């Protein structure tokens, strides 16, 4: 594997050993109805059942356990990150296990359920504007004030390696897999998965999926150069609003086979299908992968790519955004 990448497969193997005692081996589920709709065999890697409700605990815990001891003598005074919610929850949980204070920079537009969960795990929340620039500027200020260290949600190598452990599990759970479809925001998960897959079984395709309203990964692949979103994206898939970065881009450029973009309606439809047909309460970000497989663009993929594993990235749903939940009143005691 090219030395220019920020991680190697050895880092993923190390991450697996580092975190396996504290994360769930999440199940892979299937649906005959969704197979019929897609015209392929679909396997759903259910990271919504992971600790803190998303795949993010893998990278966060690997960073806390692996990065921090190598960085400072003893425990750091604090860890800091910026996150739309899931990485913030994961880092807070991981830091709490090690007795380290956590400060999470959260965009004001983040779902309320994710903000409440971060607070419930014991972190201090600091709000920012929804742009990448604002998040990073506020995080740097908090780092200076707390003398903490930054654990970037998707560009930190230890985080990327941790996310790559998903692929190790998939290859064991679905040995005949032909492709993985992964939602992409900052690219940490798809980069870690691509490093792992292309090392162990390079014939397996790795596809990224993202909202057309936040298509920086697609544009970057199209142009052959890193092309971040110019403005904060407007999408229901709040977990993939971040742009890919300097560490994830080279891996995506070289090892991700294609990028599929999907509309907001396609995301909503796919998410609802999973709710109704599989009885899995995924968040819209997790619906992006299925939306891609059901899209017209995906019909260009060879029919030989038959067994497809879709990563259901998380299940932290803001239930108050559903009209019937808003209308429901708590029963009297």
From Swiss-Prot:
One cellular-component annotation, GO: neuronal cell body
**Sequence positions that bind Mg(2+) 1:** 13
**Binding positions (Mn(2+)):** 210, 214, 216
Record-listed Mg(2+) 2 binding positions = 178
Q: What is its EC number?
A: 5.1.1.18, 4.3.1.18, 4.3.1.17
**Which residues take part in binding Ca(2+) 4?**
247
Spell out which residues are annotated as carrying Phosphothreonine.
71
This entry's comment on induction and repression of expression is: Not induced further in the cerebellum or frontal cortex following two weeks of intraperitoneal injections of the antipsychotic haloperidol.
Known post-translational modifications? S-nitrosylated, leading to decrease the enzyme activity.
Q: Which UniProt keywords apply?
A: Allosteric enzyme, ATP-binding, Calcium, Isomerase, Lyase, Magnesium, Metal-binding, Nucleotide-binding, Phosphoprotein, Pyridoxal phosphate, S-nitrosylation
List cofactor names only.
Answer: Mg(2+); Mn(2+); Ca(2+); pyridoxal 5'-phosphate
List residues binding Ca(2+) 1: 69
- What does the entry list as the binding residues for Mg(2+) 4? 247
The Gene Ontology biological process terms listed for this entry are: D-serine biosynthetic process; D-serine metabolic process; L-serine metabolic process; pyruvate biosynthetic process; response to ketamine; response to lipopolysaccharide; response to xenobiotic stimulus; serine family amino acid metabolic process
GO molecular function terms listed in the Swiss-Prot or TrEMBL record? ATP binding; calcium ion binding; D-serine ammonia-lyase activity; glycine binding; identical protein binding; L-serine ammonia-lyase activity; magnesium ion binding; PDZ domain binding
Which residues participate directly in catalysis?
56 (proton acceptor), 84 (proton acceptor)
UniProt: Ca(2+) 3 binding residues:
210, 214, 216
**Residues reported in the UniProt entry to bind Mg(2+) 3:** 210, 214, 216
Binding of Ca(2+) 2 occurs at 81
UniProt cross-references to CDD domains, sorted A to Z: Thr-dehyd
Q: Which residues bind ATP?
A: 31-33, 51-52, 89, 121, 279, 316
PROSITE patterns from the entry? DEHYDRATASE_SER_THR
Please give the family membership noted in the entry: Belongs to the serine/threonine dehydratase family.
Oligomeric and partner information: Homodimer.
* Function description: Catalyzes the synthesis of D-serine from L-serine. D-serine is a key coagonist with glutamate at NMDA receptors. Has dehydratase activity towards both L-serine and D-serine.
What protein name applies here?
Answer: Serine racemase
Species of provenance: Rattus norvegicus (Rat)
Taxonomy of origin reads: Eukaryota, Metazoa, Chordata, Craniata, Vertebrata
């Amino acid at each position: 594997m090219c030395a220019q990448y920020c991680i190697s497969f050895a880092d993923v193997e190390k991450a697996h050993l580092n975190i396996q005692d504290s994360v769930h081996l999440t199940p892979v589920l299937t649906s005959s109805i969704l197979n019929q709709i897609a015209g392929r065999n679909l396997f759903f890697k259910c990271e919504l059942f992971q600790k803190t409700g998303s795949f993010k605990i893998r990278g966060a815990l690997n960073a806390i356990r692996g990065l921090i001891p190598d960085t400072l003598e003893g425990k750091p005074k604090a860890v800091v990150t910026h996150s739309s919610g899931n990485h913030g929850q994961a880092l807070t949980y991981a830091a709490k296990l090690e007795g380290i204070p956590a400060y999470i920079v959260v965009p004001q537009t983040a779902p309320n359920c994710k903000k409440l969960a971060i607070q419930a795990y014991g972190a201090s929340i600091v709000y920012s504007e929804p742009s990448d620039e604002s998040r990073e500027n506020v995080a740097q200020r908090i780092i200076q004030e707390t003398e903490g260290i930054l654990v970037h949600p998707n560009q930190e190598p230890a985080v990327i390696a941790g996310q790559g452990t998903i692929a190790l599990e998939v290859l064991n759970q679905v040995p005949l897999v032909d492709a993985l479809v992964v939602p992409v925001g900052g690219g940490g998960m798809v980069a870690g998965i691509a490093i792992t897959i292309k090392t162990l079984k390079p014939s397996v395709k790795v596809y990224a999926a993202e909202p057309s309203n936040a298509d920086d990964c697609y544009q970057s692949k199209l142009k052959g150069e890193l092309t971040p979103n110019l403005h904060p994206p407007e999408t229901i898939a709040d977990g993939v609003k971040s742009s890919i970065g300097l560490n994830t881009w080279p891996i995506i450029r070289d090892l991700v086979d294609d990028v599929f973009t999907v509309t907001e309606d396609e995301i909503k439809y796919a998410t609802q299908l999973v709710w109704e047909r599989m009885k899995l309460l995924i968040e819209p970000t997790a619906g992006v992968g299925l939306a891609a497989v059901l899209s017209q663009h995906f019909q260009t993929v060879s029919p030989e790519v038959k067994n497809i594993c879709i990563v259901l990235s998380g299940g932290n749903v803001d239930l108050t955004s559903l009209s019937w939940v808003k209308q429901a009143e708590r029963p009297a005691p």
